[in-house]
């Protein structure tokens, strides 16, 4: 017999480590951009499982690919070759504009691998070349080294000394970065658009200036595209807006369409920094994950979603700006790119998220007062209008 909502919540809280702040809602079913809870209530989802469900829920191509691969071969380890991994590698290389790929399981793993490669690259040049510079308000994961690279004091408290060799500077401030750059820096790690920090888009020239500083000091430029990648911003990857190509690019979230898969990509010149045995993982790039990657990326391409995201994102942003004009004392900024949008409010964002949920719309609050909107890439204009109407109602009431 199916468990009721109360039982599910109580049993989850009994067994799961208490590391998540959850809403009292039990997800049961998803289709397109809609989800249903276990009491039959329907919601328009403008959060996509934290920017993960790029094709929405229950996309037939993705479901078919995973189902067929599961019936064929789920796992065999990377000690052997598989055809589906080759297919996935090809489409990731094409989408990222890179040559060599490493598959992992989550964004933090991808970022760990990228920093590890950068450290080995740097130390091969000089034993003191191991510093990694990242940005205040950044988020790169909750594993121990990604924690040190993450620019939020909140995540650092209670763990004693963090991993050494990490330096934080203000995001978008080239002078602050320049003051910390020297020949002991092996890498600069940045999000092309900050996600958890509040959907911050840097000044247009900033990434070009960072690239120049990295080149001057022979430091690798790492772009964390875990949240910004896979058509989310109206380009395959956000770096393509600026034309500044990183030396290492990390990916996760949307690349599996909901299946846990991540990794990093490098150009050919960095392909042999790692030697056999230097890096690896049991599950990364398993056949099931690769089937999800191949289905997701080929569907984004065949359905023309990159251009559609750019178009719908502009429409969405304009609608949010209309709300800003309507509530100038409550909405202080609207920013973002494609379908990665942030609406900054004057007060706390949590009541707005809760009001939207009561009106059957799912959005998120990050950085305390930024309503973050990262819907499935397939969201329709009609569904955008539903989200905007719920935000309008929430703003009117707060």
Briefly describe each language-model feature range.
Residues 2-398:
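Conserved N-terminal phosphate-binding loop of PLP-dependent enzymes in the Aspartate aminotransferase
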